[in-house]
Amino acid sequence: MGVERKIITRGSGPSPASGDKVSIHYTGWIYDPKKANKGFQGKQFDSSRSPGRGPLVVNIGQGKVIKGWDEGVMQMSLGEKSTLTITPDYGYGDKAAGKIPANSTLIFEVELLKIN
């Protein structure tokens, strides 16, 4: 349970610490185990790369985002792109959040662009 990180592209910089302001590009999907073996991530629910959007800027490790992001992003290095698979207890738990049903496993492709 928790967060599993799979590196797509290795970074070459430092990792953020709790309280650091980070800039992140991300795309999020609701995991669908019935279709996972066909290379399907799930149903996309959000992306910072959508037209008119930009990177998310947030203080990491401060509970401003879901626990899976706080833990997963702090394991990344600057410039890294990774897939984070986040179980419900590290996501939104038993509560629905917008387009995300309760008890959903989430998949995020996350790119750590900047650490301030």
Swiss-Prot record:
Per the record, the domain of life is Eukaryota
**Compartments it resides in:** Cytoplasm
Activity-regulation annotation? Inhibited by both FK506 and rapamycin.
Q: Which InterPro entries match?
A: FKBP-type_PPIase (IPR050689), PPIase_dom_sf (IPR046357), PPIase_FKBP_dom (IPR001179)
Q: Which Cys pairs does UniProt list as disulfide-bonded?
A: none
Q: Which residues form the PPIase FKBP-type domain?
A: 19-116
Q: What is its EC number?
A: 5.2.1.8
Instruction: Supply the SUPFAM superfamilies for this chain.
Output: FKBP-like (SSF54534)
Q: Which GO terms describe its molecular function?
A: peptidyl-prolyl cis-trans isomerase activity
| Gene Ontology CC terms, in alphabetical order | cytoplasm
Official protein name in the record: FK506-binding protein 1
Which species is this UniProt entry from?
Aspergillus oryzae (strain ATCC 42149 / RIB 40)
